[in-house]
Amino acid sequence: MAIRILIPTPLRAYTEKKESVLLEGNTVGELLRGLTATYAPLKKHLFDDTGSLRNFVNVYVNDEDIRYLQKEQTQVSEKDTVSIVPSIAGGRS
């Protein structure tokens, strides 16, 4: 079953400028690992040196933050859409 993963603008440079990618997987973790296997330069932007999802990378399944579900073990199905949303900090101090 193919799941759509939405790629944010700042990360499209690493996915051949694709706005979304269809991948096979049963969990968010499987999808993210498949994504970084297909687009290797993306890995360092999503995962740290220990293989953990970076703290500033937010992942949603149909608008639900996976941190409040089962994190990377969150199950997905064909009707789901996974969104990657990197946190952006800024402003004046």
What are these regions (language model features)?
Residues 1-93:
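Ubiquitin-like/PB1-type beta-grasp interaction modules and other compact soluble beta-rich domains
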